Amino acid sequence: MLRRTFIGALSAGALLMTNGMILKGADAPAGEVAKNVIRRQPYYFTVADRKFRSGKGDVAFLGGSITEMDGYRPMICEYLKKKYPQTQFNFIDAGVSSTCSNLGAFRVEEDVIQRCEGGKGPDLFFVEYAVNDNQDGFFNLEQSIRGMEGVIRRIKAANPDAAIVMIFFANIPLMEKYRAGEVPTSIQAHTAVAEHYGISTVNVAKELQEEIDAGNTTWEIYGDVHPAPQGNRMVADMIEKLLDYVWRVPATCSLCALRSSEVEPLDPYSYGTAGWVDFDAAQTEGFT
Protein backbone atom coordinates (compact mmCIF):
# COMPACT_ATOMS: atom_id res chain seq x y z
CA MET A 1 0.00 0.00 0.00
CA LEU A 2 1.30 3.43 -0.90
CA ARG A 3 2.39 5.40 2.13
CA ARG A 4 1.64 9.08 1.78
CA THR A 5 2.08 12.39 3.54
CA PHE A 6 1.10 15.99 2.85
CA ILE A 7 2.90 18.63 0.87
CA GLY A 8 1.42 22.11 0.84
CA ALA A 9 1.73 25.38 -0.96
CA LEU A 10 3.88 28.01 0.70
CA SER A 11 3.56 30.34 -2.26
CA ALA A 12 0.89 31.35 -4.74
CA GLY A 13 -0.98 28.36 -6.13
CA ALA A 14 -1.57 27.27 -9.69
CA LEU A 15 -2.93 29.83 -12.15
CA LEU A 16 -6.55 29.54 -13.23
CA MET A 17 -6.08 29.79 -16.98
CA THR A 18 -8.53 29.77 -19.88
CA ASN A 19 -6.82 30.17 -23.27
CA GLY A 20 -3.92 31.84 -21.51
CA MET A 21 -6.15 34.28 -19.65
CA ILE A 22 -7.79 34.23 -16.24
CA LEU A 23 -11.21 35.49 -15.29
CA LYS A 24 -11.42 37.61 -12.18
CA GLY A 25 -14.42 36.24 -10.35
CA ALA A 26 -14.82 39.29 -8.14
CA ASP A 27 -15.55 41.41 -11.23
CA ALA A 28 -18.31 39.13 -12.48
CA PRO A 29 -21.98 40.01 -12.06
CA ALA A 30 -23.82 38.13 -9.32
CA GLY A 31 -27.46 37.77 -8.52
CA GLU A 32 -29.82 36.06 -6.11
CA VAL A 33 -31.58 33.23 -7.94
CA ALA A 34 -33.72 32.38 -4.91
CA LYS A 35 -33.53 33.19 -1.24
CA ASN A 36 -30.01 32.30 -0.04
CA VAL A 37 -28.96 31.07 -3.49
CA ILE A 38 -26.41 33.28 -5.28
CA ARG A 39 -25.55 32.86 -8.95
CA ARG A 40 -22.11 33.86 -10.21
CA GLN A 41 -20.37 33.26 -13.57
CA PRO A 42 -23.28 31.65 -15.49
CA TYR A 43 -21.02 31.17 -18.52
CA TYR A 44 -19.31 28.19 -16.90
CA PHE A 45 -22.67 26.46 -16.46
CA THR A 46 -23.33 27.03 -20.16
CA VAL A 47 -20.04 25.28 -20.93
CA ALA A 48 -21.11 22.35 -18.73
CA ASP A 49 -24.50 22.25 -20.45
CA ARG A 50 -22.83 22.00 -23.85
CA LYS A 51 -20.59 19.20 -22.62
CA PHE A 52 -23.53 17.27 -21.20
CA ARG A 53 -25.49 17.66 -24.43
CA SER A 54 -22.53 16.21 -26.32
CA GLY A 55 -23.21 12.91 -24.55
CA LYS A 56 -20.69 12.80 -21.72
CA GLY A 57 -20.02 14.63 -18.48
CA ASP A 58 -17.95 14.49 -15.31
CA VAL A 59 -19.76 15.59 -12.15
CA ALA A 60 -17.95 15.51 -8.81
CA PHE A 61 -18.94 16.02 -5.19
CA LEU A 62 -16.29 16.84 -2.55
CA GLY A 63 -16.87 17.22 1.17
CA GLY A 64 -17.35 15.36 4.42
CA SER A 65 -19.91 12.81 5.55
CA ILE A 66 -22.78 15.03 4.35
CA THR A 67 -21.48 14.44 0.84
CA GLU A 68 -20.49 10.81 1.46
CA MET A 69 -23.92 9.80 2.78
CA ASP A 70 -26.95 8.83 0.73
CA GLY A 71 -28.31 12.37 0.83
CA TYR A 72 -28.39 15.39 -1.46
CA ARG A 73 -25.74 13.98 -3.80
CA PRO A 74 -27.77 11.10 -5.30
CA MET A 75 -30.75 13.45 -5.57
CA ILE A 76 -28.72 15.81 -7.75
CA CYS A 77 -27.42 12.87 -9.76
CA GLU A 78 -31.02 11.80 -10.47
CA TYR A 79 -31.94 15.37 -11.41
CA LEU A 80 -29.09 15.50 -13.93
CA LYS A 81 -29.92 12.09 -15.40
CA LYS A 82 -33.51 13.20 -15.97
CA LYS A 83 -32.46 16.52 -17.46
CA TYR A 84 -29.91 14.90 -19.77
CA PRO A 85 -31.30 11.39 -20.44
CA GLN A 86 -28.90 10.70 -23.32
CA THR A 87 -25.78 11.67 -21.38
CA GLN A 88 -23.31 9.15 -20.01
CA PHE A 89 -22.36 10.68 -16.67
CA ASN A 90 -19.32 9.93 -14.57
CA PHE A 91 -20.51 10.75 -11.06
CA ILE A 92 -17.72 11.03 -8.49
CA ASP A 93 -18.44 10.74 -4.76
CA ALA A 94 -15.39 12.22 -3.02
CA GLY A 95 -16.97 12.68 0.39
CA VAL A 96 -14.94 11.48 3.38
CA SER A 97 -16.38 11.61 6.89
CA SER A 98 -15.06 14.22 9.36
CA THR A 99 -12.68 15.84 6.88
CA CYS A 100 -12.23 19.57 6.42
CA SER A 101 -11.34 21.88 3.56
CA ASN A 102 -7.60 21.63 4.20
CA LEU A 103 -7.62 17.87 3.62
CA GLY A 104 -9.95 18.46 0.68
CA ALA A 105 -7.23 20.53 -0.97
CA PHE A 106 -4.81 17.64 -0.59
CA ARG A 107 -7.35 15.04 -1.79
CA VAL A 108 -8.89 16.84 -4.75
CA GLU A 109 -6.23 15.91 -7.32
CA GLU A 110 -6.37 12.16 -6.67
CA ASP A 111 -9.96 11.81 -5.50
CA VAL A 112 -11.61 14.14 -8.04
CA ILE A 113 -9.46 15.42 -10.91
CA GLN A 114 -7.73 12.16 -11.83
CA ARG A 115 -11.05 10.31 -11.75
CA CYS A 116 -12.42 12.53 -14.52
CA GLU A 117 -12.05 11.78 -18.22
CA GLY A 118 -8.44 12.36 -19.23
CA GLY A 119 -7.63 13.65 -15.76
CA LYS A 120 -8.92 17.05 -16.86
CA GLY A 121 -11.20 17.75 -13.93
CA PRO A 122 -14.98 17.89 -13.58
CA ASP A 123 -17.42 19.79 -15.77
CA LEU A 124 -19.65 20.41 -12.75
CA PHE A 125 -18.28 20.42 -9.21
CA PHE A 126 -20.06 20.58 -5.85
CA VAL A 127 -18.12 21.27 -2.65
CA GLU A 128 -19.19 21.59 1.00
CA TYR A 129 -17.00 22.13 4.07
CA ALA A 130 -18.78 24.81 6.13
CA VAL A 131 -19.96 22.36 8.80
CA ASN A 132 -16.73 20.41 9.21
CA ASP A 133 -14.48 23.47 9.16
CA ASN A 134 -16.68 24.66 12.03
CA GLN A 135 -17.29 21.61 14.20
CA ASP A 136 -14.40 19.27 13.33
CA GLY A 137 -11.52 21.59 12.46
CA PHE A 138 -12.56 24.55 14.64
CA PHE A 139 -10.87 26.61 11.93
CA ASN A 140 -10.31 30.33 12.12
CA LEU A 141 -10.91 32.56 9.09
CA GLU A 142 -7.41 32.12 7.72
CA GLN A 143 -7.49 28.33 7.94
CA SER A 144 -10.88 28.08 6.23
CA ILE A 145 -9.80 30.38 3.41
CA ARG A 146 -6.57 28.48 2.82
CA GLY A 147 -8.33 25.13 2.60
CA MET A 148 -11.26 26.15 0.41
CA GLU A 149 -9.15 28.35 -1.83
CA GLY A 150 -6.77 25.45 -2.31
CA VAL A 151 -9.65 23.24 -3.48
CA ILE A 152 -10.91 25.85 -5.94
CA ARG A 153 -7.50 26.66 -7.39
CA ARG A 154 -6.75 22.98 -7.98
CA ILE A 155 -10.08 22.44 -9.75
CA LYS A 156 -9.70 25.55 -11.91
CA ALA A 157 -6.10 24.69 -12.76
CA ALA A 158 -7.31 21.32 -14.09
CA ASN A 159 -10.42 22.65 -15.84
CA PRO A 160 -10.61 26.46 -16.11
CA ASP A 161 -14.21 26.20 -17.34
CA ALA A 162 -15.48 24.03 -14.49
CA ALA A 163 -18.86 25.14 -13.14
CA ILE A 164 -18.71 25.15 -9.35
CA VAL A 165 -21.41 25.19 -6.67
CA MET A 166 -20.33 25.81 -3.09
CA ILE A 167 -22.84 24.64 -0.46
CA PHE A 168 -23.00 25.83 3.14
CA PHE A 169 -24.74 23.10 5.12
CA ALA A 170 -26.14 23.62 8.61
CA ASN A 171 -25.44 22.80 12.22
CA ILE A 172 -26.77 24.47 15.36
CA PRO A 173 -23.68 26.66 16.01
CA LEU A 174 -23.80 28.07 12.48
CA MET A 175 -27.49 28.93 12.82
CA GLU A 176 -26.95 30.47 16.25
CA LYS A 177 -24.33 32.78 14.76
CA TYR A 178 -26.87 33.97 12.21
CA ARG A 179 -29.44 34.50 14.95
CA ALA A 180 -26.91 36.69 16.76
CA GLY A 181 -26.56 38.83 13.65
CA GLU A 182 -23.14 37.43 12.74
CA VAL A 183 -21.82 35.48 9.78
CA PRO A 184 -20.24 32.18 10.89
CA THR A 185 -16.49 32.06 10.40
CA SER A 186 -16.40 29.10 8.00
CA ILE A 187 -19.18 30.57 5.86
CA GLN A 188 -17.54 34.00 5.92
CA ALA A 189 -14.29 32.44 4.71
CA HIS A 190 -15.86 30.29 2.03
CA THR A 191 -18.00 33.19 0.81
CA ALA A 192 -14.85 35.28 0.42
CA VAL A 193 -13.38 32.54 -1.78
CA ALA A 194 -16.63 32.24 -3.75
CA GLU A 195 -16.77 35.97 -4.40
CA HIS A 196 -13.10 36.11 -5.40
CA TYR A 197 -13.42 33.31 -7.96
CA GLY A 198 -16.99 33.92 -9.10
CA ILE A 199 -18.51 30.77 -7.63
CA SER A 200 -22.22 30.24 -7.04
CA THR A 201 -23.29 29.52 -3.46
CA VAL A 202 -26.20 27.76 -1.76
CA ASN A 203 -26.55 28.82 1.88
CA VAL A 204 -28.47 26.01 3.57
CA ALA A 205 -27.55 27.19 7.08
CA LYS A 206 -29.11 30.61 6.57
CA GLU A 207 -32.14 29.20 4.77
CA LEU A 208 -32.82 26.66 7.50
CA GLN A 209 -32.36 29.19 10.30
CA GLU A 210 -34.88 31.51 8.65
CA GLU A 211 -37.37 28.72 8.00
CA ILE A 212 -37.14 27.42 11.57
CA ASP A 213 -37.53 30.90 13.03
CA ALA A 214 -40.56 31.49 10.80
CA GLY A 215 -42.16 28.32 12.17
CA ASN A 216 -42.11 26.55 8.81
CA THR A 217 -39.94 23.61 9.91
CA THR A 218 -37.82 22.32 12.78
CA TRP A 219 -34.27 21.11 13.27
CA GLU A 220 -35.67 17.62 13.93
CA ILE A 221 -37.61 17.58 10.66
CA TYR A 222 -34.51 18.72 8.78
CA GLY A 223 -32.69 15.81 10.38
CA ASP A 224 -29.70 17.15 12.33
CA VAL A 225 -26.17 17.65 10.95
CA HIS A 226 -26.66 14.69 8.60
CA PRO A 227 -29.97 15.66 7.02
CA ALA A 228 -32.96 13.34 6.87
CA PRO A 229 -34.55 12.73 3.45
CA GLN A 230 -36.75 15.80 3.89
CA GLY A 231 -33.73 17.94 4.76
CA ASN A 232 -31.74 16.66 1.81
CA ARG A 233 -34.73 17.30 -0.43
CA MET A 234 -34.72 20.93 0.74
CA VAL A 235 -31.03 21.22 -0.16
CA ALA A 236 -31.48 19.53 -3.53
CA ASP A 237 -34.38 21.86 -4.34
CA MET A 238 -32.18 24.89 -3.66
CA ILE A 239 -29.44 23.53 -5.93
CA GLU A 240 -31.92 22.62 -8.65
CA LYS A 241 -33.33 26.16 -8.60
CA LEU A 242 -29.83 27.45 -9.26
CA LEU A 243 -29.17 24.99 -12.08
CA ASP A 244 -32.59 25.54 -13.67
CA TYR A 245 -31.92 29.28 -13.63
CA VAL A 246 -28.43 29.23 -15.14
CA TRP A 247 -29.42 26.68 -17.79
CA ARG A 248 -32.63 28.44 -18.81
CA VAL A 249 -30.81 30.99 -20.98
CA PRO A 250 -27.32 30.16 -22.31
CA ALA A 251 -24.71 32.71 -21.26
CA THR A 252 -22.00 34.03 -23.54
CA CYS A 253 -18.44 34.77 -22.53
CA SER A 254 -19.15 38.50 -22.36
CA LEU A 255 -16.60 38.96 -19.58
CA CYS A 256 -13.52 38.18 -21.66
CA ALA A 257 -12.47 41.82 -21.49
CA LEU A 258 -12.14 41.37 -17.74
CA ARG A 259 -9.59 38.59 -18.11
CA SER A 260 -6.00 39.23 -17.06
CA SER A 261 -2.79 37.26 -16.75
CA GLU A 262 -3.56 35.92 -13.28
CA VAL A 263 -5.82 36.03 -10.26
CA GLU A 264 -3.86 36.54 -7.09
CA PRO A 265 -4.85 34.19 -4.27
CA LEU A 266 -6.68 35.64 -1.31
CA ASP A 267 -3.97 34.08 0.82
CA PRO A 268 -0.53 33.37 -0.70
CA TYR A 269 -0.24 30.42 1.69
CA SER A 270 -3.46 28.74 0.58
CA TYR A 271 -3.15 25.13 -0.51
CA GLY A 272 -3.31 25.75 -4.24
CA THR A 273 -0.51 23.29 -4.97
CA ALA A 274 -1.28 20.79 -2.22
CA GLY A 275 -0.84 17.10 -2.96
CA TRP A 276 0.46 13.74 -1.82
CA VAL A 277 3.96 12.30 -1.78
CA ASP A 278 5.20 8.87 -0.87
CA PHE A 279 6.83 8.79 2.57
CA ASP A 280 9.97 7.32 1.01
CA ALA A 281 10.31 10.39 -1.22
CA ALA A 282 9.56 12.93 1.51
CA GLN A 283 12.39 15.09 2.81
CA THR A 284 12.52 14.89 6.59
CA GLU A 285 15.80 16.70 7.26
CA GLY A 286 17.60 19.85 6.19
CA PHE A 287 14.83 22.39 6.78
CA THR A 288 15.82 25.88 7.93
Please tell me what each predicted stretch does.
Residues 65-67, 98-101:
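Short strand->helix junction
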Residues 74-90, 99, 103-249:
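Alpha-helical cap/lid subdomain in secreted, periplasmic
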Residues 62-63, 94, 167:
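Short hydrophobic segments within beta-strands
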Residues 1-62, 66-89, 118-123, 233-288:
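N-terminal secretory targeting modules
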